[in-house]
A protein has these predicted regions:
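Short functional micro-motifs and their immediate structural scaffolds
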Residues: 91, 109-112
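Cys/His-enriched microdomains
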Residues: 81-84, 102
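Interaction interfaces in information-processing and related assembly proteins
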Residues: 1-77, 97, 114
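Cysteine-rich micro-motifs
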Residues: 100-109
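Short, cysteine/histidine-rich loop/knuckle motifs that typically chelate Zn2+
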Residues: 85-86, 106
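Short alpha-helical
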Residues: 14, 90, 102-103
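C-terminal structural segments of small proteins and small subunits
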Residues: 92-96
C-alpha cells in the first residue's frame, strides 16, 4: 500500500511540525510567566490556562505521532489494514479517513457502545 505509506508519512510530518510549534509556544508561555505569581497576578490565571491548554495539545500531538509510527510499523510488518480485535480487513474508506485506525468499524462501534 504505497499510497497509505505516503499518507502516513505526510501525517507524521504534520505531527512533528505541530509538536515543534507547540513546544516553542509552551516555552514562550513559560518564559512570559517567569517570575509571575499565578496566584496573585491578574494575568496568572490566564497564563496557567494557556500553559495547561498548550500542554494538552502537545500531549494530543505526541499521541498522534505515536499512532502514526505504530501504523507505519504495522505497514512494514504486513498487519496494516487488519483489525486488531477481530482480524478482519479494515474498510479502505475508513483507512482513507483515519489512516491510523486499528479496528474495523463494527469493532470500533461495539467498543464505544459498551
Amino acid at each position: 500500500m504505497p499510497d497509505q505509506r505516503e499518507l502516513l508519512l505526510a501525517e507524521r510530518a504534520l505531527a512533528v511540525d505541530r509538536i515543534q510549534l507547540l513546544e516553542r509556544e509552551f516555552a514562550d508561555i513559560a518564559a512570559s510567566a517567569d517570575g509571575t505569581d499565578d496566584e496573585h497576578d491578574p494575568e496568572g490565571a490566564t497564563l496557567a490556562f494557556e500553559r495547561q491548554h498548550t500542554a494538552a495539545l502537545l500531549d494530543q500531538a505526541r499521541a498522534q505521532l505515536a499512532a502514526v509510527d505504530q501504523a507505519l510499523r504495522r505497514l512494514a510488518d504486513g498487519s496494516y489494514g487488519t483489525c486488531t480485535r477481530c482480524g478482519r480487513l479494515i474498510n479502505a474508506d475508513r483507512l482513507a479517513a483515519r489512516p491510523v485506525a486499528t479496528t474495523c468499524i463494527p469493532c470500533a462501534t461495539s467498543r464505544r457502545t459498551r
